[in-house]
Amino acid sequence: MSTSVPVKKALSALLRDPGNSHCADCKAQLHPRWASWSLGVFICIKCAGIHRSLGTHISKVKSVDLDTWKEEHLVKLIQFKNNLRANSYYEATLADELKQRKITDTSSLQNFIKNKYEYKKWIGDLSSIEGLNDSTEPVLHKPSANHSLPASNARLDQSSNSLQKTQTQPPSHLLSTSRSNTSLLNLQVSSLSKTTSNTSVTSSATSIGAANTKTGNRVGEFGQRNDLKKSILSLYSKPSAQTQSQNSFFTSTTPQPCNTPSPFVNTGITATNNNSMNSNSSSNISLDDNELFKNVWS
C-alpha cells in the first residue's frame, strides 16, 4: 500500500516550511527526512534512532520516503506546522542559550531527548503558542465532495419514500396478475395429473404385454426340449417285434459256406515239389562240372 497523492503533497508542503529546515532535537542536521508523527516534529535519522529506543508509547517514528503515510499521521504535524512552534511548546522553560545549541555528542543527545519528551522537563502550555488554534489554511486539501452530498441525500430520500409507498399499497394490476398466475398454476397441475395417469396406464399395458410374450416364449422352449428328449430316448429303446422278424428273415436267406477243397491248394503243393526237383538236378550238374575241371588242372 503506497501513500496517497494528497498526503504526499501535504508532507512536501510541510518540509518546505523554513521552520523545518533543521532537526528539532540536535539542531545540527539540515533538511530532516524523518518525523515523530505522535509528537509532531521533523527529526534526522540519528535522532530517529534515539526516539525509537524510547518506545512507541512516547514517540512513533516514520520515514518520509520509505514508510506509508495516512491522513491520521499528519494531525500533529499540521497542528504545530514546523519545528520552531513545536520547540516553543516542548522547550518552553529551557534557557535561551541552550535552545539554539547544536548537540553532536550521542550520549548528551540521548539525555537531552529523554528529558525533553520522556520526563517533559521543559514542557509548556499549548495556549501560549501563538496561532495554534487559529483557523489557517489547511495543508491537506480534500476533494469538495460535501457540495454534492445534499442533492444525493435528497435523491435517496425520494427513492426511499417511493419504495415505502409501493410496499404499503400494492397496485391492482399486480393482484390481477397474481390471480391469473394461480389459475394457470391450477390448470397446469390438472393437466400434469392427467398426463401422469395416462402414462401410468400405458406403462401397465406394455408391462402386461411383455409378460405374455415372455410366457409364450417359455412354453415354446419347453415344447422343443420335450421333442429333443423323445428323439434321444427313441435311439436307446428296445426294438419292436417287427424289427426282430425282419432280422431273422435276413439271417435265414444268407448262404452258408461249403467245405469243398479248393484246387488252388493242390496246385501250390505240386509247384513246390517241381521246384525242389529242379534244384537237385542243378546241384548234380554243378558237381560234375567241378570234377571235370579238377581233371583238367591235374
From Swiss-Prot:
Disordered, as annotated region: 137-180
Principal cellular location given in the protein's record: cytoplasm
Localization per record: Cytoplasm; Golgi apparatus
Domain Arf-GAP residue range list: 8-130
Keyword Transcription regulation found: no
Phosphoserine modifications at: 180, 183, 207
Signal sequence extent: none
Domain of life where this protein originates: Eukaryota
Molecular-function annotations in GO: GTPase activator activity; zinc ion binding
Polar residues: bias regions: 145-171
Key words of the record: Acetylation, Cytoplasm, Golgi apparatus, GTPase activation, Metal-binding, Phosphoprotein, Zinc, Zinc-finger
InterPro entries cross-referenced by the UniProt entry: ARF_GTPase-activating, ARFGAP/RecO, ArfGAP_dom, ArfGAP_dom_sf
Positions bearing N-acetylserine: 2
Zinc fingers (C4-type) by residue: 23-47
Gene Ontology BP term (one): intra-Golgi vesicle-mediated transport
Gene3D superfamilies: Arf GTPase activating protein
A Pfam cross-reference name: ArfGap
GO cellular component, one term: cytoplasm
PROSITE patterns reported in the protein's UniProt record: ARFGAP
Further remark: Present with 5350 molecules/cell in log phase SD medium.
Role: GTPase-activating protein for the ADP ribosylation factor family.
Name of the protein this chain belongs to: ADP-ribosylation factor GTPase-activating protein effector protein 2
Species the sequence originates in: Saccharomyces cerevisiae (strain ATCC 204508 / S288c) (Baker's yeast)
Lineage summary: Eukaryota, Fungi, Dikarya, Ascomycota, Saccharomycotina
Gene: AGE2
